[in-house]
């Protein structure tokens, strides 16, 4: 009963990105700049794909889902950080902290599995072009997206429930600008050995899509290099280049965050999370649209339609 009362009244203090006021002011301005660009950029991708019938195919269906996930992903943390900075308060309730952690794990996993589905789509398109429409049918695409969301939720729920069962004594300062599982485990005065094992299991589940992406691209490049045509190789690189760039950015920052011992985590590592939670979702629309003629044409049509109306 006492633990329930503690959970209902407990508040955490979010130390921010650096914990230094002057630097926090800089990151506030940075986030104030990044967040609207992230929302507008990803929303434009979704609207362009929905409005252009030429983009109603598996590749762009998956891209639209990725853009939606990126909108939700950045919205879980940045608005709270901006609101806290404006109000001068750094506090977040226990329930709010768990909610934030749940959606970060959920959407992070969904993002990861969506990237794997996109790699699989490219592998099928290049290595089995004659069977592409059969394999990547609308039903298959829906199953891939639904599976991504289900796995994301299934991975997030156990971690959230386990964290909710922990006791927190004394220090309640979270070494980040949002509630993440790693700093919360470090704050707990409960036995966290099982929780740490579950966290690394979760990281393993999160890493499965990376293995799928690697296998997919091995298939892509083994197919491409069998074709004695420089043009074919260049076309494959142009088709897959944007996706590979996003995968490298995303997994590079995630590995910097989680592929390390729990004892090594400190406030300095919060800077890495800025790349994952804010910068990468902002860059994705630019990466996919600037290198894609069809997407640029669809965006141009969308702008022309809005201007003429």
Swiss-Prot record:
<feature type="transmembrane region" description="Helical; Name=3">
    <location>
        <begin position="101"/>
        <end position="120"/>
    </location>
</feature>
<feature type="topological domain" description="Cytoplasmic">
    <location>
        <begin position="219"/>
        <end position="235"/>
    </location>
</feature>
<keyword id="KW-0675">Receptor</keyword>
<feature type="glycosylation site" description="N-linked (GlcNAc...) asparagine">
    <location>
        <position position="5"/>
    </location>
</feature>
<feature type="transmembrane region" description="Helical; Name=6">
    <location>
        <begin position="236"/>
        <end position="258"/>
    </location>
</feature>
<dbReference type="InterPro" id="IPR000725">
    <property type="entry name" value="Olfact_rcpt"/>
</dbReference>
<keyword id="KW-0297">G-protein coupled receptor</keyword>
<feature type="transmembrane region" description="Helical; Name=5">
    <location>
        <begin position="196"/>
        <end position="218"/>
    </location>
</feature>
<keyword id="KW-0472">Membrane</keyword>
<feature type="transmembrane region" description="Helical; Name=7">
    <location>
        <begin position="271"/>
        <end position="290"/>
    </location>
</feature>
<feature type="topological domain" description="Cytoplasmic">
    <location>
        <begin position="50"/>
        <end position="57"/>
    </location>
</feature>
<feature type="transmembrane region" description="Helical; Name=2">
    <location>
        <begin position="58"/>
        <end position="79"/>
    </location>
</feature>
<feature type="transmembrane region" description="Helical; Name=1">
    <location>
        <begin position="26"/>
        <end position="49"/>
    </location>
</feature>
<keyword id="KW-1015">Disulfide bond</keyword>
<protein>
    <recommendedName>
        <fullName>Olfactory receptor 1A1</fullName>
    </recommendedName>
</protein>
<feature type="topological domain" description="Extracellular">
    <location>
        <begin position="159"/>
        <end position="195"/>
    </location>
</feature>
<comment type="function">
    <text>Odorant receptor.</text>
</comment>
<keyword id="KW-1003">Cell membrane</keyword>
<feature type="topological domain" description="Extracellular">
    <location>
        <begin position="80"/>
        <end position="100"/>
    </location>
</feature>
<keyword id="KW-0552">Olfaction</keyword>
<keyword id="KW-0812">Transmembrane</keyword>
<feature type="topological domain" description="Cytoplasmic">
    <location>
        <begin position="291"/>
        <end position="309"/>
    </location>
</feature>
<feature type="glycosylation site" description="N-linked (GlcNAc...) asparagine">
    <location>
        <position position="264"/>
    </location>
</feature>
<feature type="topological domain" description="Extracellular">
    <location>
        <begin position="259"/>
        <end position="270"/>
    </location>
</feature>
<feature type="disulfide bond">
    <location>
        <begin position="97"/>
        <end position="189"/>
    </location>
</feature>
<feature type="topological domain" description="Cytoplasmic">
    <location>
        <begin position="121"/>
        <end position="139"/>
    </location>
</feature>
<keyword id="KW-0716">Sensory transduction</keyword>
<dbReference type="GO" id="GO:0050911">
    <property type="term" value="P:detection of chemical stimulus involved in sensory perception of smell"/>
</dbReference>
<dbReference type="GO" id="GO:0004930">
    <property type="term" value="F:G protein-coupled receptor activity"/>
</dbReference>
<dbReference type="InterPro" id="IPR017452">
    <property type="entry name" value="GPCR_Rhodpsn_7TM"/>
</dbReference>
<dbReference type="GO" id="GO:0004984">
    <property type="term" value="F:olfactory receptor activity"/>
</dbReference>
<keyword id="KW-0807">Transducer</keyword>
<keyword id="KW-1133">Transmembrane helix</keyword>
<keyword id="KW-0325">Glycoprotein</keyword>
<feature type="transmembrane region" description="Helical; Name=4">
    <location>
        <begin position="140"/>
        <end position="158"/>
    </location>
</feature>
<comment type="similarity">
    <text>Belongs to the G-protein coupled receptor 1 family.</text>
</comment>
<dbReference type="GO" id="GO:0005886">
    <property type="term" value="C:plasma membrane"/>
</dbReference>
<dbReference type="InterPro" id="IPR000276">
    <property type="entry name" value="GPCR_Rhodpsn"/>
</dbReference>
<feature type="topological domain" description="Extracellular">
    <location>
        <begin position="1"/>
        <end position="25"/>
    </location>
</feature>
<dbReference type="Pfam" id="PF13853">
    <property type="entry name" value="7tm_4"/>
</dbReference>
